[in-house]
Swiss-Prot record:
The keyword Oxidoreductase does not apply. It is found in: Cell membrane. The keyword Cell membrane applies. Keywords: Cell membrane, Membrane, Transmembrane, Transmembrane helix. This is Uncharacterized protein AF_0864. The chain crosses the membrane at residues 13-35, 50-72, 77-96, 101-115. It comes from the Archaea. It is a multi-pass membrane protein. GO terms for cellular component: plasma membrane. Its main location: membrane.
Length: 126
């Protein structure tokens, strides 16, 4: 098996860190859903429901990012595909939010460029 490229290691670690933040956001959303049900925050229409669904969304997203990190770390082809898809979606989102999306375009463009280099694709077998 090929040795994992350093950039792939960095990306996998960044995906894990992002997943941790999503899980933290899920925990905060769950807490806010609880608070909304017992305080004046609950007077805002659908506040409790909003926070509950936000928590579910963040949990699912964190799980998918953690799975992607695993795929990147282990050199699985599906991990590469997930990373490419997420990066492409982020790039499109940044393009749609110009001019404030310039930093995202540069960073995500560089990541997408890196993921499509021959030695990286060979590591993933794609």
């Amino acid at each position: 098996m090929l040795e994992r490229p350093t950039g792939v290691t960095v990306l996998a670690i960044l995906y894990v860190l992002a997943a941790v933040f999503f899980f933290l956001a899920a925990a905060v959303s769950g807490y806010l859903a609880q608070v909304a049900s017992t305080t004046q925050l609950g007077e805002i229409p659908y506040a409790e429901l909003f926070f509950a669904f936000s928590g579910i969304f963040f949990s699912i997203t964190g799980t998918v990012w953690l799975i992607t990190a695993y795929g990147l770390w282990k050199g699985r082809g599906w991990g590469w595909w997930l990373a490419v898809i997420f990066t492409a979606f982020g790039l499109i989102s940044s393009l749609l939010s110009l001019p404030k999306g310039v930093v995202g375009i540069v960073v995500l463009g560089a990541i997408l460029y890196y993921l499509t280099r021959r030695h990286v694709r060979e590591f993933f077998g794609v």
